Design a protein with these regions (language model features):
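Terminal accessory carbohydrate-recognition/targeting modules of carbohydrate-active enzymes
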Residues: 1-216
Length: 216
């Protein structure tokens, strides 16, 4: 399976090409090939939480990457907001998408060529995101911004004062739990990394497949 740059950057075509990865623990990852969630069931890490109910729950909605070179930032993420607004339009940097063994994206930002691979642990609630810098003409940094949800796939989350915004440091990362009854979400890297804690709410996200089903 392969799609080229022309196919990936045309949202009329690529936005509704969806992917699903599952494992034996009951966890799954569901999104579009351009990484823009279009259903409330979508998420990078969705798991059952039997301590709460019989539903699946979105812990990690998405993970935005930003390539930084010479002080300039290039965000590779893509989200749809109300009113047909898309931001930050990172799909325009996709050179190709391939799926042989695992889903693989290749991005080009100026002189930077970056590969991203996605895979699941087969037996536990764990997803791996692997980045490989294939080419760079100068010093390059990669910043990751996780979007947390901690909600049932059947519900919406809105800004509130109940969410626990604190975190605990773990090896090469942090762990967080937004609401009582949920398991901790561990976010770790394979090497020591600088973590900058700056929590914020993102408002007005739009899921077009839900509107088609009659949900606001």
């Amino acid at each position: 399976l392969r799609f080229d740059k022309a196919q990936m950057t045309n949202l009329q075509e690529s936005l509704y090409k969806e992917m699903l990865i599952t494992n034996r623990s009951g966890a799954y990852c569901s999104t579009t090939l351009v990484g823009c969630n279009i259903r409330k069931y979508d998420g990078l890490l969705v798991i059952p939480v039997p301590e709460l109910d019989d539903e699946n729950h979105v812990l990690l909605s998405s993970l935005d990457e930003t390539v930084i070179q010479h002080g300039a930032e290039f965000n590779l993420g893509l989200h749809k907001y109300q009113g047909e607004n898309y931001s930050p339009k990172g799909h325009k940097y996709i050179v190709s998408f391939e799926w042989e063994q695992v889903p693989t994206w290749t991005y080009r930002v100026g002189g930077v060529l970056l590969r991203k691979e996605l895979s699941f642990d087969t037996s536990i609630h764990r997803i791996y995101v692997r980045y490989t810098l294939l080419d760079a003409h100068s010093e390059t940094q990669l910043r990751l911004r996780p979007f947390l949800a901690f909600r049932s796939v059947r519900q919406w989350t809105h800004e509130n004062g109940v969410a626990n915004r604190s975190y605990n440091e773990v090896e090469n990362g942090i762990r967080m739990c937004l609401y009582q009854g949920y398991p901790d979400l561990y976010m770790q890297t394979s090497k020591p990394t600088d973590w900058h804690y700056c929590p914020d709410w993102y408002r007005g996200m739009d899921y077009p497949k839900e509107r088609e089903r009659g949900y606001n």
